[in-house]
Curated annotation (Swiss-Prot):
Species of origin: Bacillus subtilis (strain 168)
Subcellular location: Cytoplasm
Function in brief: Participates in various redox reactions through the reversible oxidation of its active center dithiol to a disulfide and catalyzes dithiol-disulfide exchange reactions.
Protein name per UniProt: Thiol-disulfide oxidoreductase YkuV
PROSITE patterns reported in the protein's UniProt record: THIOREDOXIN_2 (PS51352)
């Protein structure tokens, strides 16, 4: 995805965990952080406490949605996804992308990957990999400042 592109529709899921959200619900009032992760991704698990901290710190100002992107057959087990999500305190809605519908819509190749959309649903920041949480927070704060 390129910057300023609109958020894709959140469709094609195998399932939703922790509730379901639509693109329409995410656009209008608050910016949105969509993060891709996988149960086989060590870096994702390492970064999750920081993502959760974000979610809790900005809960009134920011929508947070997780996308589980399988990287192997083992990653397709719904029980394991649910179990890993619980172990890592992923309480935000999780789009289970077993068929890579959202992965393809986002043109995403990485986990972890982070997409920050402003309140109008335009992509404002993208980053992938395990580092750079400070950069992510900076970008989120910038988009939040525009909302006030």
């Amino acid at each position: 995805m390129k910057l300023r592109q609109p958020m894709p529709e959140l469709t094609g899921e195998k399932a939703w965990l922790n509730g379901e959200v639509t693109r329409e619900q995410l656009i209008g009032e608050k910016p949105t952080l969509i993060h891709f992760w996988s149960i086989s991704c060590h870096l994702c698990k390492e970064a999750m406490p920081q993502v959760n901290e974000f979610r809790d710190k900005y809960q009134d100002q920011l929508n947070v949605v997780a996308v589980h992107m399988p990287r192997s057959e083992d990653d397709l087990d719904p029980g394991k996804i649910k179990e890993t999500a619980a172990e890592h305190d992923i309480t935000q809605p999780i789009f289970v992308d077993s068929d890579h519908a959202l992965t393809d819509a986002f043109e995403n190749e990485y986990v972890p990957a982070y997409y920050v959309f402003d309140k109008t649903g335009q992509l404002r920041h993208f980053q992938a990999g395990g580092s750079g949480m400070k950069m992510l927070e900076k970008r989120v704060n910038r988009v939040l400042a525009e909302t006030e």
